[in-house]
Amino acid sequence: MKYYETSFEEYLQSKNSFDIHPEIKIQTNKLPENINQLNNLIVYGPSGSGKYSVALDIINKYSHNELKYDKHTTVYTDKGNFNLKISDIHYEVDISLLGCNSKQLWHEIFFKIVDIISIQKDKEGIILCKNFQNIHSELLDIFYSYIQQYNHSQANIKIVFIIITEQISFIPFQIIQTSQVINIKKPSQKICNTYLEISNNSSNTKKTQEDFSKYI
């Protein structure tokens, strides 16, 4: 999956101008208003189906500023530095970039996020795991222990996981059991053509197939 250097707000504006998954909006509208009642989520589907935009739309529901401000922070480790794209409520980790030292690097990243959330007023946050289908087997074996650590009523902070993946069959049952699964289908060529037609009629800049892929 490609993730373009585009702001969260631009992703959401594009999605709201032409929603290629109105059936998913019906489903996500039923999610709780309070993040403390939100379960972990698995958003899965083929590449180019719009999983990231759906995930951002869900996260936006719990943002205090509608994801208008995105920032970056760096996690410094013995194995190298890792840049995180963050908002007021969520933290993005591209699992495919963790490499062969993913187990140790993930540990450092996770507790960096915990430290940030711990000093915030509401002490709550969402970790968005992108390209989860590329997770190393050693990390996958212990991933559930991180998920359950701060996602129960007695925890001093609240962390919700949103997993974006192209497959789901490899994910351990424990993770699936504690998550709500949202299946995203790849948009048809007809939907793509409609998007391009609407966009080109309302803009002086001609949109292409690549532009369609960029914002889903």
Describe each PLM feature range.
Residues 1-132, 140-142, 152-163, 173-175, ...:
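P-loop/Walker A NTP-binding region and its immediately flanking N-terminal helices
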Residues 131-135, 168:
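Conserved Walker B
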Residues 144-146:
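Short, conserved "post-DEAD/DEAH" coupling segment immediately C-terminal to helicase motif II
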Residues 168-169, 189:
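Alpha-helix N-cap/helix-start and coil->helix boundary motif
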Residues 213-215:
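C-terminal helical "lid" of AAA+/P-loop NTPase domains
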